[in-house]
């Protein structure tokens, strides 16, 4: 079995690819099936969040596997009003919802209760099968050199 042990800072030309949903891209130890049918084991540093486009390598540096973010069932909110998007982010964040934030658009794993809440604010929510790349804070450390302060204690009431 091929063991992928590192994410390359400077990606090399891929020799293979693997399509993974976010719930697998947050795991440091997991067995996966490459798009060519071969099995591989991810043996990566804990806390690493894989993003679409990342390239993984085996220890020998002879295999280079590009990560592809799988299409997933997501709710999509599109809005030109930054205030309304900020309001949506506030309410979703208050519920600790993993959230992908882009200019004029939000994505989260499809949830009809959350969809209904945002519709009550007057936002349009649609369903899509799209790649999901949530903010790293929802899962793990960012994979591209972004560093965020972490506090030993985090508590608040709801």
From Swiss-Prot:
Originating gene: ureE
Major localization class: cytoplasm
Molecular function GO labels: nickel cation binding; unfolded protein binding
Gene Ontology cellular-component annotations: cytoplasm
NCBIfam families: PRK13261.1-1
Protein location: Cytoplasm
Protein name stated in the entry: Urease accessory protein UreE
GO BP annotation list: protein folding; protein-containing complex assembly; urea metabolic process
SUPFAM superfamilies per UniProt: Urease metallochaperone UreE, C-terminal domain, Urease metallochaperone UreE, N-terminal domain
Keyword Cytoplasm part of the UniProt annotation: yes
Top-level taxonomy: Bacteria, Pseudomonadati, Pseudomonadota, Gammaproteobacteria, Enterobacterales
Organism field: Klebsiella pneumoniae (strain 342)
Alphabetic keyword roster: Chaperone, Cytoplasm, Nickel
Protein family per UniProt: Belongs to the UreE family.
Record function comment: Involved in urease metallocenter assembly. Binds nickel. Probably functions as a nickel donor during metallocenter assembly.
């Amino acid at each position: 079995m091929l063991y992928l042990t590192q994410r390359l800072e400077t990606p090399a030309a891929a020799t293979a690819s693997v399509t993974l949903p976010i719930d697998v891209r947050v795991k440091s130890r997991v067995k996966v099936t490459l798009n060519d049918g071969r099995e591989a084991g991810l043996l990566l540093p804990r806390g690493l969040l894989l993003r679409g486009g990342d390239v993984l390598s085996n220890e020998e540096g002879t295999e280079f596997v590009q990560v592809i973010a799988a299409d997933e069932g997501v709710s999509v909110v599109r809005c030109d009003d930054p205030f309304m998007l900020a309001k949506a982010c506030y309410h979703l964040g208050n519920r600790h919802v993993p959230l992908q934030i882009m200019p004029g658009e939000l994505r989260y794993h499809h949830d009809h209760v959350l969809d209904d809440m945002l519709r009550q604010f007057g936002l349009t929510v649609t369903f899509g099968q799209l790649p999901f790349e949530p903010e790293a804070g929802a899962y793990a450390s960012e994979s591209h050199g972004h560093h965020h302060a972490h506090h030993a204690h985090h508590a608040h009431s709801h």
